[in-house]
Curated annotation (Swiss-Prot):
Phosphothreonine: modified positions: T1048
Gene from which this protein is expressed: ASAP1
Species assigned in the record: Homo sapiens (Human)
Protein name per Swiss-Prot or TrEMBL: Arf-GAP with SH3 domain, ANK repeat and PH domain-containing protein 1
UniProt feature, compositional bias: Polar residues: 735-747, 862-872, 1001-1018
GO molecular function, one term: GTPase activator activity
C-alpha cells in the first residue's frame, strides 16, 4: 500500500498524471477493491486507485461521445434511405396508375392485346411497390426506431452529462481530504512536530462517507455504461438481423412475383413482332400513296423548300409589310409624371431607331433603338399602344385606328429589319444595342458596393461572375468555385465570355457587400477569410465552408415552418436578399408552400412565376438556378413550365429553359406546357418551348427587364419639365444632396458646377426647384394640356396673407436662375449616390457662369439683378434647411403619396382662379416662363423706345412692371384657362426674387424713386387689372413684409430683409373629412379611414397638411390633401 504522502503528492500533481493517462481500472478490479474496502477500511488500498477510477471514467466518456456522433450519422443516413424509398414507392404507384389508364385506352379502341399487356405491367409494378413498402416499414421499425430510442434515451445530451454525479463525488472527496490533512498538520505543529505523511489508516474512518459516495457513483456510472453497450451493440445488431430477413423476403417475393409473368412475356414478345410487321406494312402503303398524290399535284420542290424556309421569329407582334419600315408623323405621348397628360410629339422611325422630339426645338430628341423595345397594343383602347424599352415604358396614342395600325406595323417592321441586319453582320458597332446594353449592365454591376474586390479573398478588380449567386470573384477563387460544381456556383468571365442579359440579372441586384452581409455575418475571430496572398488550400477550406456548409451565414429561423414562412414572404415582397437569407439557412427552395388561395402543392418558384413581371425576374432566376429540381409538380400535375404557359410568362420561360427542364411532362389534364401554350395562343411561349424541344434554344438569351441603369441613358424625356406635382398619393422619396453657399461664389455659379455638393444633410433644396421649371407646356405641337385628372386644390387660409400674380414680377430679375420652355437650362447633376430614375432629366452640359454680361439696374451703387437673385436664392436655401420634407427624386415605382418638398411656404405668390380674371391668369403664366437671359452687354432701353415685339432680355428691370405680351415666333398659341393646372405654385419654378422683396427694398432706399413710378402706372393703367378682391399696393406691400421673414440671409454681403409682420388675426378652425382610407408610410404621417373628420392645425406644404382626428388629439400627423374633402362649417 502506498504511503499517504506519496498519494498526496500524486493528488497535487494530478494534472501531469492525467496528461500521461496512467493505468486504468477494470470492472472486475473495481469490484474487488471496493469489496475489500467495504470489509476492512483500515487495511484497504482503495485510496491508491482513486485516480485510476477517474481516468477510466474519462476514457469511457470519450468513447461514448464518439459512438453518439457515429450513431447520429447512421440515423441520418437511414432516414434518408427511408424518405427516398417512400418517394420511390409513391412514384411507382403513380407510374402504375397512369400505365393502367393508358392500357384501358387501348382496350376501348379495339386493341385488346396491347391493352392487356399494359395492364399486366401496371399490376406487376403495384405488387413490387407493395413489397418495397413492407421493406421500408421493416427498416423503420427495426433500425430507425432502435436508433431513436438510444439517441433520445441513454445517449441523450452532450459530452460529460453522464459523469456529472461522479465528478461531484470526486470533488467532495478531494475537498474533505484536503481539510483533514490541513487539520492534522496544524495539530502536529502546535505540539512542535512536523507531519510529513498521513497514512490511510488514520483517515479511513473520517473519510468513509465520502469514499462510499464515490464508490456508489462509480457503480452507477459503470452500470449505465453497461446498459448503453448492450443497446448499441447486441440490441442494434439483433434488429439489423431482423431487417436482413425482411430484405431476403423482399427479394424472394419480388422474384416470385416477376416469375408469374415469365411465360406471358415470352408470348407477348412474339405477338409484338407480328404487330410491328403489320404496322410497317401499313406505313409503307401510306408512304407510297403520299408520293403518288404529291406527284399528281406537280409541286414545285424549289418553291416548297423556300416557303418552308423560316426566317427568324421575334416572338412578338408581326406588322403589315405594306406600311414599310419608315414613317414620320405625330403621336400623343402620355407623360411619365403624376398628372399623366397626353402631349403631342413629332415622331419618326428610320433604320431601327424611333426618334421622339421634345416640346422645344433646342433640346436634342430622344432616340430609342427598337432592338431593345417591344411594341404592345392596348387591349382597352384601340388607338393606344405601349413601347416597352429596357428601362422605361412609353404610352402612345394615334389619331385614329388606321394611323394606329400604320404605326404598329412600321415599328414592328423596322425592328425586324434591324434584327435581320444584325444577324447578317451589316449593323455597325455603334448601333448594336444589345451589346451596348450588356456592356452597360456589366459596368453598372462593377460599380455596386463591394464589387471592386473579390467576394472571398478581397483581391482587387475581380472579373469572374457567379451567375447563380450574383457575386464577383478573382481568378484564383473562381477556380475553386468551378471545383464545387455548377449546383453550388456557376462561373463565367465578364471579359472572356459572351454573356446574355439573362445571366446578369442576379449580378445587377445582389453585389458582393449585400451577399457577404448574409453569408459572412457570423465570421469567427480571428477571421478564417483568406487574403489575396493566401494559398489555394486556405481558399478552398474557406470557400467550401462558406458556400457548401453555409457555416458563417446568419441564422434567423429555428424551425422548418418558420423558414418556409420566410421563403413565402420573400417571394411576396420581392426581396432578393431575404430570399438569399432563406437559402443560406438551408431551406429546400422547392418545398410546397402552405399559402391559402393558391394551388395545392405550389412551390416558391410556381408563385414567383405566377406573380412575375419585368421588375421581379431576378427572383425567378435565383430560384431556377439554385433549387435543383425544376420538374416539381403541383397537386394538379403542373410544373413551372405549365405555369409559364398558363400565365403567359415568356421571360420566365427563357430563364427556365436555360437550365434544361423536362419539357414533355403532362399534368392531370394530360397536357404538356407546349399544349397549353398552343391552346391559349401564347405564341411567344409556344415558340420558345418548340425551340427547347428541338434542341435549338440558345441559353445566352436576352430578357426584357427593368434594368434601371445608373449611367446616362439615351432615352431622354422632357416629362420632368412638363409635369408638376399634383395631389395624388405618391411615395415621399429621399431628398437629393443639398447645395450650400460660400462667401466667394454665388449660388448661381455653384449650381453651374457639375459636381457641386455639400456634406450637410439638412440644408437642402428641393430638386424640383431646378427640374420642374415649366408650368404650362408651350409645345408647338400641342398648345393644350388638359388637366382634368388632377382635382382642384383647396383654397389657402386668408391668414397667410394676400396673393399677388406672378406676372407682376420684373422679368429681368429672373435672368440668373429663371428658365422657360423656350430656353431651358439643364438642372444640376444628381448627387453621387443618386440612382438615376426613369424620370430624371439628363445631366447638365458644362456652361459658363450665368451672370456673365448681366447689366446692373438702378443707380451704380445699387445691387444688380444677379445679386437680387442671389439674395432670394440664399433665402430659399436657408428656409429649406429647417424643413424635414422630401423631394421628387425617388424612383418612379408605385407612386403613392405626394412628395413633401423642402420649400414649404412658397405658395404666397400663387394665383387663385376664383379672384383673378382668365386673361390675367393666362398671361401671368406665360410671362413667368419666358426666357430670362439678356444678351451680354445690352443696356435696357427706355420704356418709350420699346419695339412692338420686344425681346424679354431687353425689357427694363423695373419692379412691378408688367410688360406687353411678347410675340416671339416660337411661342405656342395662347393657352386657354381650361388647359392650365389647378393652381400654379412657385415651388415648381426656379428660385428667383419676389416682387415683395423688391418693394420692401425700395422703401429702404435700395430702389430709386424713379423705379417705383412705373410700378404704380402699370398697376393702374395696364389692361390686365386685378379684381377688387386684390388690392395691389397694400397686398404687395403686406406680402413683401411677410416674405421677408422667410428669407434669412446667409452671407455677410446679403442685404438684411425687413422683419416679417406677424399675423395676429385669429384663424378659423378648418375641418376636413376623409374620402379614402390611408395607411401611413412614415412615422410622422397620419393613418385614417374613410369618413373620419380631421382638424387642420397647419400646412407642411401645398399637398401635405398637418392635423389630428377630431376627438382623438393623440392621433396626429401629416396627411395628403387629395385624400380629404374640406368641410364648410
Amino acid at each position: 500500500m502506498r504511503s499517504s504522502a506519496s498519494r498526496l503528492s500524486s493528488f497535487s500533481s494530478r494534472d501531469s498524471l492525467w496528461n500521461r493517462m496512467p493505468d486504468q481500472i477494470s470492472v472486475s478490479e473495481f469490484i474487488a477493491e471496493t469489496t475489500e474496502d467495504y470489509n476492512s477500511p483500515t487495511t484497504s488500498s482503495f485510496t491508491t486507485r482513486l485516480h485510476n477510477c477517474r481516468n477510466t471514467v474519462t476514457l469511457l466518456e470519450e468513447a461514448l461521445d464518439q459512438d453518439r456522433t457515429a450513431l447520429q450519422k447512421v440515423k441520418k443516413s437511414v432516414k434518408a434511405i427511408y424518405n427516398s424509398g417512400q418517394d420511390h414507392v409513391q412514384n411507382e404507384e403513380n407510374y402504375a396508375q397512369v400505365l393502367d389508364k393508358f392500357g384501358s385506352n387501348f382496350l376501348s379502341r379495339d386493341n385488346p392485346d396491347l391493352g392487356t399487356a399494359f395492364v399486366k405491367f401496371s399490376t406487376l409494378t403495384k405488387e413490387l411497390s407493395t413489397l418495397l413498402k413492407n421493406l421500408l416499414q421493416g427498416l423503420s421499425h427495426n433500425v430507425i426506431f432502435t436508433l431513436d430510442s438510444l439517441l433520445k434515451g441513454d445517449l441523450k445530451g452532450v459530452k460529460g452529462d453522464l459523469k456529472k454525479p461522479f465528478d461531484k463525488a470526486w470533488k467532495d472527496y478531494e475537498t474533505k481530504f484536503t481539510k483533514i490533512e490541513k487539520e492534522k498538520r496544524e495539530h502536529a505543529k502546535q505540539h512542535g512536530m512536523i507531519r510529513t505523511e498521513i497514512t490511510g489508516a488514520e483517515i479511513a474512518e473520517e473519510m468513509e462517507k465520502e469514499r462510499r459516495l464515490f464508490q456508489l457513483q462509480m457503480c452507477e456510472y459503470l452500470i449505465k455504461v453497461n446498459e448503453i453497450k448492450t443497446k448499441k451493440g447486441v440490441d442494434l445488431l439483433q434488429n439489423l438481423i431482423k431487417y436482413y430477413h425482411a430484405q431476403c423476403n423482399f427479394f424472394q417475393d419480388g422474384l416470385k412475383t416477376a416469375d408469374k409473368l415469365k411465360q406471358y412475356i415470352e408470348k407477348l414478345a412474339a405477338d409484338l413482332y407480328n404487330i410491328k410487321q403489320t404496322q410497317d406494312e401499313e406505313k409503307k402503303q401510306l408512304t407510297a400513296l403520299r408520293d403518288l398524290i404529291k406527284s399528281s399535284l406537280q409541286l414545285d420542290q424549289k418553291e416548297d423548300s423556300q416557303s418552308r424556309q423560316g426566317g427568324y421569329s421575334m416572338h412578338q407582334l408581326q406588322g403589315n409589310k405594306e406600311y414599310g419600315s419608315e414613317k414620320k408623323g405625330y403621336l400623343l405621348k402620355k407623360s411619365d409624371g403624376i398628372r399623366k397628360v397626353w402631349q403631342r410629339r413629332k415622331c419618326s422611325v428610320k433604320n431601327g431607331i424611333l426618334t421622339i422630339s421634345h416640346a422645344t426645338s433646342n433640346r436634342q430628341p430622344a432616340k430609342l433603338n427598337l432592338l431593345t423595345c417591344q411594341v404592345k397594343p392596348n387591349a382597352e383602347d384601340k388607338k393606344s399602344f405601349d413601347l416597352i424599352s429596357h428601362n422605361r415604358t412609353y404610352h402612345f396614342q394615334a389619331e385614329d385606328e388606321q394611323d394606329y395600325v400604320a404605326w404598329i406595323s412600321v415599328l414592328t417592321n423596322s425592328k425586324e429589319e434591324a434584327l435581320t441586319m444584325a444577324f447578317r453582320g451589316e449593323q455597325s458597332a455603334g448601333e448594336n444595342s444589345l451589346e451596348d446594353l450588356t456592356k452597360a449592365i456589366i459596368e453598372d454591376v462593377q460599380r455596386l458596393p463591394g464589387n471592386d474586390i473579390c467576394c472571398d479573398c478581397g483581391s482587387s478588380e475581380p472579373t469572374w461572375l457567379s451567375t447563380n449567386l450574383g457575386i464577383l470573384t478573382c481568378i484564383e477563387c473562381s477556380g475553386i468555385h468551378r471545383e464545387m460544381g455548377v449546383h453550388i456556383s456557376r462561373i463565367q468571365s465578364l471579359e472572356l465570355d459572351k454573356l446574355g442579359t439573362s445571366e446578369l440579372l442576379l449580378a445587377k441586384n445582389v453585389g458582393n457587400n449585400s451577399f457577404n452581409d448574409i453569408m459572412e455575418a457570423n465570421l469567427p475571430s480571428p477571421s478564417p477569410k483568406p487574403t489575396p496572398s493566401s494559398d489555394m488550400t486556405v481558399r478552398k477550406e474557406y470557400i467550401t465552408a462558406k458556400y457548401v456548409d453555409h457555416r458563417f451565414s446568419r441564422k434567423t429561423c429555428s424551425t422548418s415552418s418558420a423558414k418556409l414562412n420566410e421563403l413565402l414572404e420573400a417571394i411576396k415582397s420581392r426581396d432578393l436578399l431575404a430570399l438569399i437569407q432563406v437559402y443560406a439557412e438551408g431551406v429546400e427552395l422547392m418545398e410546397p408552400l402552405l399559402e391559402p388561395g393558391q394551388e395545392l402543392g405550389e412551390t416558391a418558384l410556381h408563385l414567383a412565376v405566377r406573380t412575375a413581371d419585368q421588375t421581379s425576374l431576378h427572383l425567378v432566376d435565383f430560384l431556377v438556378q439554385n433549387c435543383g429540381n425544376l420538374d416539381k409538380q403541383t397537386a394538379l400535375g403542373n410544373t413551372v413550365l405549365h405555369y409559364c404557359s398558363m400565365y403567359s410568362k415568356p421571360e420566365c420561360l427563357k430563364l427556365l429553359l436555360r437550365s434544361k427542364p423536362t419539357v414533355d411532362i403532362v399534368n392531370q389534364a394530360g397536357e404538356t406546357a407546349l399544349d397549353i401554350a398552343k391552346r391559349l395562343k401564347a405564341t411567344q411561349c409556344e415558340d420558345l418551348l418548340s425551340q427547347a424541344k428541338s434542341g435549338k434554344f440558345n441559353p445566352h438569351v436576352h430578357v426584357e427587364y427593368e434594368w434601371n441603369l445608373r449611367q446616362e441613358e439615351i432615352d431622354e424625356s422632357d416629362d420632368d419639365l412638363d409635369d408638376k406635382p399634383s395631389p395624388i398619393k405618391k411615395e415621399r422619396s429621399p431628398r437629393p444632396q443639398s447645395f450650400c453657399h460660400s462667401s466667394s461664389i454665388s449660388p448661381q455659379d455653384k449650381l453651374a458646377l457639375p459636381g457641386f455638393s455639400t456634406p450637410r444633410d439638412k440644408q437642402r433644396l428641393s430638386y424640383g426647384a431646378f427640374t420642374n421649371q415649366i408650368f404650362v407646356s408651350t409645345s408647338t405641337d400641342s398648345p393644350t394640356s388638359p388637366t382634368t385628372e388632377a382635382p382642384p386644390l383647396p383654397p389657402r387660409n386668408a391668414g397667410k396673407g394676400p396673393t399677388g400674380p406672378p406676372s407682376t414680377l420684373p422679368l429681368s430679375t429672373q435672368t440668373s436662375s429663371g428658365s422657360s420652355t423656350l430656353s431651358k437650362k439643364r438642372p444640376p447633376p444628381p448627387p453621387p449616390g443618386h440612382k438615376r430614375t426613369l424620370s430624371d432629366p439628363p445631366s447638365p452640359l458644362p456652361h459658363g457662369p450665368p451672370n456673365k454680361g448681366a447689366v446692373p439696374w438702378g443707380n451704380d451703387g445699387g445691387p444688380s439683378s444677379s445679386s437680387k437673385t442671389t439674395n432670394k436664392f440664399e433665402g430659399l436655401s436657408q428656409q429649406s434647411s429647417t424643413s424635414s420634407a422630401k423631394t421628387a427624386l425617388g424612383p418612379r415605382v408605385l407612386p403613392k403619396l405626394p412628395q413633401k418638398v423642402a420649400l414649404r411656404k412658397t405658395d404666397h405668390l400663387s394665383l387663385d382662379k376664383a379672384t383673378i380674371p382668365p386673361e390675367i391668369f393666362q398671361k401671368s403664366s406665360q410671362l413667368a416662363e419666358l426666357p430670362q437671359k439678356p444678351p451680354p452687354g445690352d443696356l435696357p432701353p427706355k420704356p418709350t423706345e420699346l419695339a412692338p415685339k420686344p425681346q424679354i432680355g431687353d425689357l427694363p428691370p423695373k419692379p412691378g412692371e408688367l410688360p406687353p405680351k411678347p410675340q416671339l415666333g416660337d411661342l405656342p398659341p395662347k393657352p386657354q384657362l381650361s388647359d392650365l393646372p389647378p393652381k400654379p405654385q412657385m415651388k415648381d419654378l426656379p428660385p428667383k426674387p419676389q416682387l415683395g422683396d423688391l418693394l420692401a427694398k425700395s422703401q429702404t432706399g435700395d430702389v430709386s424713386p424713379k423705379a417705383q413710378q412705373p410700378s404704380e402706372v402699370t398697376l393702374k393703367s395696364h389692361p390686365l387689372d386685378l379684381s377688387p378682391n386684390v388690392q395691389s399696393r397694400d397686398a404687395i406691400q403686406k406680402q413683401a413684409s411677410e416674405d421677408s421673414n422667410d428669407l434669412t440671409p446667409t452671407l455677410p454681403e446679403t442685404p438684411v430683409p425687413l422683419p416679417r409682420k406677424i399675423n395676429t388675426g385669429k384663424n378659423k378652425v378648418r375641418r376636413v373629412k376623409t374620402i379614402y382610407d390611408c395607411q401611413a408610410d412614415n412615422d410622422d404621417e397620419l393613418t385614417f379611414i374613410e369618413g373620419e373628420v380631421i382638424i387642420v392645425t397647419g400646412e407642411e406644404d401645398q399637398e401635405w397638411w398637418i392635423g389630428h382626428i377630431e376627438g382623438q388629439p393623440e392621433r396626429k400627423g401629416v396627411f395628403p390633401v387629395s385624400f380629404v374633402h374640406i368641410l364648410s362649417d
